[in-house]
Structure formats: structure tokens, C-alpha cells
């Protein structure tokens, strides 16, 4: 790259599903000599996480508007205007060649500020149904990309950038070759846990007995309660942890995953090549259902909406999957993954910066 290094501002915040894909793209472009700064909010996870990755972060004051009542809605135009002014001042100082919106409340005023300064806006939608901010920003964006088909009618499907340690796992046919014994079930409720998984899976374990071995990530503050639930049904041998620091190692251990279907989780499971039982969070937009649907359609997963996630249904499903069936599902999951998603997003950012 000749002359001055290109400059990227990443706009992403709030949840890991927005921040981690943004970090993957940022690191990829930094390795090519780009200068990267981040636009976020001071009270969400990006405030601590992004600087730990060696990336400078600027903050604007903005939060969500859903469910805040009439008073908050009346104040919203002024809040958005102030956030836009803050973002505009930050971008005037940094002078990015392109901004990349990865979702979260910060992308709205940030994207509008970039557009008002003539800076190209590249959007990436992680979920199977577009969020309100991205629906609105798509009208002014230079390029829109999507992880799953259907969020936008004409956007390129590029997948979700996932962690390199997950991408580095051996392929299912190598990883699962020669395995026997109990089916290894990884239960993941996300960092906050999932009450329905914590309540249901010990009962599933009791039904399945020694045909399964379970590693259950309970979420914060309930590890002891979940351990007691397993012990209370005569299944104290299963492993319960509050968090799993090394998800790649957990995926490598597992034969099948039982989990929510956040966008990043679904993409990681596909990249790892794992069968799954997905229990979508019951959101008004059914966002997590749409995230999981491509894997179910590919024959790699089963979706249980929360009311259908019963002890009997889950136990019968797991009991009905032989090791041969699980390997076939694992291969199907890997086949629909897009392992070069990070490179695809970074390539589009580079293309837009050159034009």
C-alpha cells in the first residue's frame, strides 16, 4: 500500500455479536497496514474490550429507544442529533477513508455522521433479519452485506466473521473419527445463561442416563444451582461451568450443541462443523429463529421454539441421533459455513476505500 495508510472507523457496540465480528475485520485490516479506530459507547462491553485489542476507541452518548416510554421517545430526536454531532466531530479529527457499521445503537448516528461528511458507509448485518438501525442506514450506505440470506433482498451473503481458533479446528470427519462412548452434549446459554436450558437439561440427562455426557455452561451466578439440579436427578457426573473461556476447545470436545441461536453462535457452530439443537430467544422480530433456519434447512440442526423445548422432545431427539447421523449433520453444518467471512468483509471495505 503506497503513501499514507488507509483509515477505517468501525462502528459497533452493545453485544459480542456486534463487537467480535468487528474486531476480526479490524485485526485483518490492521495486519495489512490500515489505521483503525472504533466508535462506541462508554457504558457497554466495547469500552473495555476494544482497547484490550490494541484499538483506540471514541465514545458517543446514545442508547436504545425500544420500550423506553413516551418521554424518552419525545427526547429521542435531540439525543440522536447530539450523538450525530459528537460522531461528526470525532470523524472530522480522524478522517477515515471508510466507516464500517457492524450494528448496535452507535451505528445510527455514526453512519449518518459519516454520510454527512461524504465518507463511504459499509454495513454488515449479522442477523437473519435486519435490525432497525441497519434497515434505516441501508438507504444511505455505499455497500450492504449480510451474514444470512433474507435480511436484505439484494445484499451479498458473506457470513459472519468468527474467531480464528474456531476456524482452525479440524474438519468434522477428522475430529469425530473413531469416537465412541456417550454422546458429548455441550449446553451453552451465552454469557448470561438461559433459564430454560438450565431448568430442562438436567431432566434430559436423567432420561438419557449414561448414553450422554454433558458440559453445561450455566451463565453467571447459577453454577451451583444447576449442579444441584443435575445431582438432584441422580446425574452429578456432568460438568457445569459458569463460563467457558476457550469456546474452540469446547466445540472440539462436543458431538452436538444445545444453545440459543444468536448470530455469532450460529456462525461459529457452522464454522466448527457441529450439529445443534437451537432454542431461539423469544424476541418480537424472531431474529434468532431466522439465524438458525439455514442450518435446519441444511439438515444440520433442529430448532425448538421455547414452548416446544420440553424434556421429552429434547431427550427423544438426542436419543434418535446415532454417531453416524451426527457426523453427517456436522459435515452439512460445515458445508454451509462461510469460513472466509472476515476476508470478504475486509475486501469490500478495501474496495470501497479505493473508489
From Swiss-Prot:
Q: Which InterPro entries match?
A: GlcNAc_MurG, Glyco_trans_28_C, GlycoTrans_28_N
Family statement? Belongs to the glycosyltransferase 28 family. MurG subfamily.
Note whether Lipid metabolism occurs among the keywords: no
**Among the entry's GO cellular component annotations, what is one?**
plasma membrane
Q: What is this protein called?
A: UDP-N-acetylglucosamine--N-acetylmuramyl-(pentapeptide) pyrophosphoryl-undecaprenol N-acetylglucosamine transferase
What is the protein's membrane topology class?
Peripheral membrane protein
Compartmental location: Cell inner membrane
Organism in which the protein naturally occurs: Salmonella enteritidis PT4 (strain P125109)
This enzyme catalyses: di-trans,octa-cis-undecaprenyl diphospho-N-acetyl-alpha-D-muramoyl-L-alanyl-D-glutamyl-meso-2,6-diaminopimeloyl-D-alanyl-D-alanine + UDP-N-acetyl-alpha-D-glucosamine = di-trans,octa-cis-undecaprenyl diphospho-[N-acetyl-alpha-D-glucosaminyl-(1->4)]-N-acetyl-alpha-D-muramoyl-L-alanyl-D-glutamyl-meso-2,6-diaminopimeloyl-D-alanyl-D-alanine + UDP + H(+)
The entry's keywords: Cell cycle, Cell division, Cell inner membrane, Cell membrane, Cell shape, Cell wall biogenesis/degradation, Glycosyltransferase, Membrane, Peptidoglycan synthesis, Transferase
Amino acid at each position: 500500500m503506497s503513501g499514507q495508510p488507509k483509515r477505517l472507523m468501525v462502528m459497533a457496540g452493545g453485544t459480542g455479536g456486534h463487537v467480535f465480528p468487528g474486531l476480526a475485520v479490524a485485526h485483518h485490516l490492521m495486519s495489512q497496514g490500515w489505521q483503525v479506530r472504533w466508535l462506541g459507547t462508554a457504558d457497554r462491553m466495547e469500552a473495555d474490550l476494544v482497547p484490550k485489542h490494541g484499538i483506540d476507541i471514541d465514545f458517543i452518548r446514545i442508547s436504545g429507544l425500544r420500550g423506553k416510554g413516551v418521554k424518552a421517545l419525545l427526547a429521542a430526536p435531540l439525543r440522536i442529533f447530539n450523538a450525530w454531532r459528537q460522531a461528526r466531530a470525532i470523524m472530522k479529527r480522524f478522517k477515515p477513508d471508510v466507516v464500517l457499521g457492524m450494528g448496535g445503537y452507535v451505528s445510527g448516528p455514526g453512519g449518518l455522521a459519516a454520510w454527512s461528511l461524504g465518507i463511504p458507509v459499509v454495513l454488515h448485518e449479522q442477523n437473519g433479519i435486519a435490525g432497525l438501525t441497519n434497515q434505516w442506514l441501508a438507504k444511505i450506505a455505499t455497500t450492504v452485506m449480510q451474514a444470512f440470506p433474507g435480511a436484505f433482498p439484494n445484499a451479498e451473503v458473506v457470513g459472519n466473521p468468527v474467531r480464528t481458533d474456531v476456524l482452525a479446528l479440524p474438519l468434522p470427519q477428522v475430529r469425530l473419527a473413531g469416537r465412541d462412548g456417550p454422546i458429548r452434549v455441550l449446553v451453552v446459554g451465552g454469557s448470561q445463561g438461559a433459564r430454560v436450558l438450565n431448568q430442562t437439561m438436567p431432566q434430559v440427562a436423567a432420561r438419557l442416563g449414561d448414553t450422554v455426557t454433558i458440559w453445561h455452561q450455566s451463565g453467571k451466578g447459577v453454577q451451583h444451582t444447576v449442579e444441584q439440579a443435575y445431582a438432584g436427578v441422580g446425574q452429578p457426573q456432568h460438568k457445569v461451568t459458569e463460563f467457558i473461556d476457550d469456546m474452540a476447545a469446547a466445540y472440539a470436545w462436543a458431538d452436538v450443541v444445545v444453545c440459543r441461536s444468536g448470530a455469532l453462535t450460529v456462525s461459529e457452530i457452522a464454522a466448527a462443523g457441529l450439529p445443534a439443537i437451537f432454542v431461539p430467544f423469544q424476541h418480537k422480530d424472531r431474529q434468532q429463529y431466522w439465524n438458525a433456519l439455514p442450518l435446519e434447512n441444511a439438515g444440520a440442526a433442529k430448532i425448538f421454539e421455547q414452548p416446544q423445548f420440553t424434556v421429552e422432545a429434547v431427550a427423544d431427539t438426542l436419543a434418535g441421533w446415532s454417531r453416524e447421523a451426527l457426523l453427517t449433520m456436522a459435515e452439512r453444518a460445515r458445508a454451509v459455513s462461510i469460513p472466509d467471512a472476515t476476508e470478504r468483509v475486509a475486501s469490500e471495505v478495501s474496495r470501497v476505500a479505493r473508489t
